[in-house]
Structures are given as C-alpha cells and as structure tokens.
From Swiss-Prot:
Interphase loop: region residues: 466-483
Region annotation Disordered: where it falls in the sequence: 1-65, 162-221
Residues with site note (Interaction with METTL14): E442, R445
Biased composition (Polar residues): 187-204
Subunit (UniProt): Heterodimer; heterodimerizes with mettl14 to form an antiparallel heterodimer that constitutes an active methyltransferase. Component of the WMM complex, a N6-methyltransferase complex composed of a catalytic subcomplex, named MAC, and of an associated subcomplex, named MACOM. The MAC subcomplex is composed of mettl3 and mettl14.
Stretches the record annotates as Gate loop 2: 511-519
InterPro entries: MT-A70 (IPR025848), MT-A70-like (IPR007757), SAM-dependent_MTases_sf (IPR029063)
Classification of source organism: Eukaryota, Metazoa, Chordata, Craniata, Vertebrata
Keywords: Cytoplasm, Differentiation, DNA damage, Methyltransferase, Nucleus, RNA-binding, S-adenosyl-L-methionine, Spermatogenesis, Transferase
Intrachain S-S bonds: none
Family label: Belongs to the MT-A70-like family.
GO biological process: one example: negative regulation of type I interferon-mediated signaling pathway
Catalysed reactions listed for this entry: an adenosine in mRNA + S-adenosyl-L-methionine = an N(6)-methyladenosine in mRNA + S-adenosyl-L-homocysteine + H(+)
Protein name (database record): N(6)-adenosine-methyltransferase subunit METTL3
Length: 584
C-alpha cells in the first residue's frame, strides 16, 4: 500500500505538470515550434562524431517515505494522550530529531495516505487560507494498533513484491545485450505520462525499433499493475457511500421508535393508583440489611424473617425447597416467612372483586379494558363435555395433565386422549396458550398442528424460590433439574384487534404449589386481548379469573352467569350431570 500511494502521488504531480505545459502552449503557440526545434537540434548534434552534451529532463523525483518514519507516525497517532485536533506542523516538530530529520511534505503525504486508508480523518487547508498544514480531526485507535502490529509483515511482503517485479521486468526486456538497461526501482516514473511521451519522441527520432517495442511492452505491464492498485483503492468506501449508510441508520432508528398509537396503548394498560407490588430487599433479613448499611434502621423494602423451631439446626443452612417443602414440621433446615408488621399486611389487601364494573364483551379487540365479567366455571371431565355449548372464544389456555412418566398428585391423560380433544370448535380466529414440559414439548407442537394452529411464539417461565433466587433443586427433570417451563403460543385464522408488542416472552415468577402457573400470564393475555371471552382448560380453583370460563375436574360445582350459555347448557344437560357418552 505504501508503494501504491507513492506512485499515485507522483502520477498526480506529473499530470499537473503536463496540464500546466498544455496551458502554456495554448497561450503561446510559438513555444510548440521552439520545443520541436530543440528536439531536432538535439538529434542533429547526436549524429556528429564529437561528444554531445545532452541535458536530461528535469523531472522531480519524489522519494517514498521512510518505513521507519511511517511506523513512528503510526505510533504517535495511536497514543491515547494525543490531543485532537492537531496539525501536520506540530506533528513534524514532534517527530523531527537531529538523528532522523523529518520534512513537512513527507508528514503531509503520510497523513493523506492514512486518511485514504480510513485510519484517520483530516481536513485540508482552504485555497484562501494562508496556512498550508493539514489538520488531523480524529483517529481510529483500533485500526492504528492493527497497522502497527502488521508493519513487520507488510515490510517483508513489500520486499518480496519488489524482487518479483524486477524479475518480471527482466523477462519482459529480454536477454539481448544491446537492449540491456540499468535496473530501476519497480513501478516508478516509467508509468508516468511524461516518461511515456519522452520515450515516444526518442523512438520517433531514430532510436531503434526493437528497443521501442520492448519498452512499450514493459510500460504496458507496469501500467496494468498500477491499474490494479488504483482499482483496489477505488473499491474503498467513498464519502457518499458513508453518508448514505449514515442516513440508513437514522431511518432505522426512526422505524424502531414507538408510534403515538403504540404509546397510547401502553399508557392505557399502565397501573393506576398506588403500586400493587413491593420490592424485596437484596439482603434478605432486616439484620443483614442493617449490617450492610450506614443507617441504624433497615430500608423500607420487604424483608424475610427466619423460622427457628426446636428441631431446626442453623448450621445446616437454608432448606432447598423453602416454603414448598413437604416436611416443614420436621425439616431441620432453616425456613423463612415475610417480615412485615400487622398493619402493613392489612393495607396490602387489594380492591375487592365486587367493585369492578361487570359486563360481557364478546367482540374481539374491545377497548373497554376496565369492564370485566365475573368468573365462571364448570366442574367436569373435559373429555366428555360438549364444549360447543360454550360458544366461541378469543383466547384459549390449557395446562394439560401430560403423561410425563412421573408420580403426580393428579391423574394424567394419554397422548391419544390429548389429540382427540375437541379444541378446534372453541375458536374460529384467536390464540391458544398451551403449557408444556419435559417430553410433552414435541407432543404439544404436534397437537397445535393437529388442532389447526400455527406456532408463533413461546413463553418461558423462569422459576424463582421464596427468596427470589433462581431454583437449583427442582423436583422435575431426569438428567438436569428443570428451572423453567414453556408455554407454546399458537394462532388460528386471521385474528383482528389484538395488541402487539406490549409484553415480552419471559416471565420471572415464584414457584408455588404443584402445577400452579404464574398469575402474570393472565395479565399478559388480558393486555393482548382486552375485554374478550376467554376459556381455560384443566383449571383448578386458583385459576378462576374474571372474563374467563374455567373447566376442570377439581372445581366446586357449576357456576355460569352468561344467559346464552346457561340456556344452551340446560338444554344439553337438563339434569346438570355431565356423564360419559355411550359411544365413547
């Protein structure tokens, strides 16, 4: 890259010189005859037997920058303590020493080279400015350090390339003694337009036809090398391309900004009034909170209190299962409970369910978020219930008792029984939330496809213990303890009026009783489809929610309030008993 930059600079200066000569010829036509006459007289004098004094053309040869100087300049620019912006005169004074003098033109040439390589950004002096120094405005330390590391390798590559070029020139010129010429540095002034014009004039004045042909071939070979290097330089990203990329990034930022409608939907579901949750203290107990702080009083966050019984051995540490332990009456490990005053417990009670405005909204996408219909449920065996009497729903959620080959405190369904459930009749357009675990993940995906749903998302429930830490000793899992559960989200038809992008697909919540899913899923579904009819399958008493109809064999009787559903239920089951059909 160093040789390429030097040749391009030399080529640029020679082009400028040729342009000046052409302009002078246009202004003074007699100068052309003078130059031609001087060429003819020179050729006539060369034919005389006496010694002729031939003045060589005064072509300014620019020596390439010293590699050591380039390395020193890279090291100077890569210093983190360098104050920017700085000019080329200041850099020249810093690098100039008595042992190795440095010229201002070399420093400017190297700075322009580094700018072309996108190592630094420079600003050239204006035409009207009296200063001729180049201003360095910013540097890329990462690229500079990479260039310093690869300096040794690049020098070895340059030496090898120079030797290859010399060998190639010798092959192009041939081995005839009459045409031998002293070796010159590769890819220098021989590729310039001035040298090419001089060689053409010499050939036309009677200098040997064979030598001119071979010199022309050599010029073509070297010109091809220069063309390749110029092409590699032109392939770098231009200022216009960089500006276009910057505009694209700004457009992407604008597209990622939420619109006024999205902000309005988020504001609609924002919690009103005081906060309904309290934050736990990171230190656990009040004693540890006081010891870690500078104040004699604990913080206002929620703390835990140790439960120390007669059989408790504090040296054993905390129980792995904490408040989910099955043997708390005899467990020797330490357990915890919430440490809060009695008045705080009374204030923590939320508003009564009866205070909510009641109303049934069966239209998908109803914006009346605050209107809720009372909870309804039916105690039954879902395999035998004719679910067509319940109508259509916008959202269906199911937590099936999968047969996962474990000892569970409830009955399970076989894989075939799960596949035969009449889920498709519950929806024409909407969403299905299906909880799966263990080997049931693949079976759940199969059931989604069988029931006519396309899986579009998957919610992860990360389980935490009573102390709000990730559990490490779960009771599920064969090879690894399971610390999470999955909820597959399927879509059917073309649902309209649902809110997109309000929640993420991760729930972090505390573990409670067996198969007790987090209550956060209900808020997530309500924000997705506010005010619509929803149904939950395989529910238990703690799953009963407003706007939901819950089906399960552990519920308390039958509680229906929707007049249309009540009429269809009485017509289908006059005696109120849901029994197994005779054809099953």
């Amino acid at each position: 890259m160093s040789d390429t930059w030097s040749h391009i600079q030399a080529h640029k200066k020679q082009l400028d010189s040729l342009r000046e000569r052409l302009q002078r010829r246009r202004k003074d036509p007699t100068q052309l005859g003078t130059e031609v006459g001087s060429v003819e007289s020179g050729s006539a004098r060369s034919d005389s037997p006496g010694p002729a004094i031939q003045s060589p053309p005064q072509v300014e040869v620019e020596h390439p920058p010293d590699p050591e100087l380039e390395k020193r300049l890279l090291g100077y620019l890569s210093e983190l303590s360098l104050s920017l912006p700085t000019d080329s005169l200041t850099i020249t004074n810093q690098l100039n020493t008595s042992e190795s003098p440095v010229s201002h033109s070399c420093i400017q040439s190297l700075l322009l080279k580094f700018s072309a390589q996108e190592l630094i950004e420079v600003r050239q002096p204006s035409i009207t400015s009296s200063s001729s120094s180049t201003l360095v405005t910013s540097v890329d330390h990462t690229k500079l350090w990479a260039m310093i590391g690869s300096a040794g390798q690049s020098q070895r590559t340059a030496v090898k390339r120079k030797a290859d070029d010399i060998t190639h020139q010798k092959r192009a010129l041939g081995s005839s003694p009459s045409i031998q010429a002293p070796p010159s540095p590769p890819r220098k002034s021989s590729v310039s337009l001035a040298t090419a014009s001089i060689s053409q004039l010499t050939a036309s004045s009677g200098g040997g036809g064979g030598g001119a042909d071979k010199k022309g071939r050599s010029n073509k070979v070297q010109a091809s090398h220069l063309d390749m290097e110029i092409e590699s330089l032109l392939s770098q990203q231009s200022t216009k391309e960089q500006q276009s990329k910057k505009v694209s990034q700004e457009i992407l930022e604008l597209l990622n900004t939420s619109s006024a409608k999205e902000q309005s939907i988020v504001e609609k579901f924002r919690s009103r009034g005081r906060a309904q949750v309290q934050e736990f203290c990171d230190y656990g107990t009040k004693e540890e909170c006081v010891q870690s702080g500078d104040t004699p009083q604990p913080c206002t966050k929620l703390h835990f209190r140790r439960i120390i019984n007669k059989h408790t051995d504090e040296s054993l540490g905390d129980c792995s299962f904490l408040n989910t332990c099955f043997h708390m009456d005899t467990c020797k490990y330490v357990h915890y409970e919430i440490d809060s005053p009695p008045e705080a417990e009374g204030d923590a009670l939320g508003p009564q369910a009866g205070a909510a405005e009641l109303g049934l909204h069966s239209t998908v996408g109803d914006s009346n978020v605050g209107k809720l219909f009372p909870s309804q449920w039916i105690c039954c065996d879902i395999r035998y219930l004719d679910v067509s009497i319940l109508g259509k729903f916008a959202v269906v959620m199911a937590d099936p008792p999968w047969d996962i080959h474990m000892e569970l405190p409830y009955g399970t369904l076989t894989d075939d029984e799960m596949r035969k459930l009449n889920i498709p009749i519950l929806q024409d357009d909407g969403f299905l939330f299906l909880w799966v675990t263990g080997r049931a993940m693949e079976l759940g995906r199969e059931c989604l496809s069988l029931w006519g749903y396309d899986r579009v998302d998957e919610i992860i429930w990360v389980k935490t213990n009573q102390l709000q830490r990730i559990i490490r000793t779960g009771r599920t899992g064969h090879w690894l303890n399971h610390g999470k559960e999955h909820c597959l989200v399927g879509v059917k038809g073309n649902p309209q009026g649902f809110n997109r992008g309000l929640d993420c697909d991760v729930i972090v919540a505390e573990v409670r009783s067996t198969s007790h899913k987090p209550d956060e899923i209900y808020g997530m579904i309500e924000r997705l489809s506010p005010g619509t009819r929803k149904i939950e399958l395989f529910g238990r008493p703690h799953n009963v929610q407003p706007n939901w109809i819950t089906l399960g064999n552990q519920l308390d009787g039958i509680h229906l309030l929707d007049p249309e559903v009540v009429a269809r239920f009485k017509k289908r089951y006059p005696d109120g008993v849901i029994s197994k059909p005779k054809n099953m």
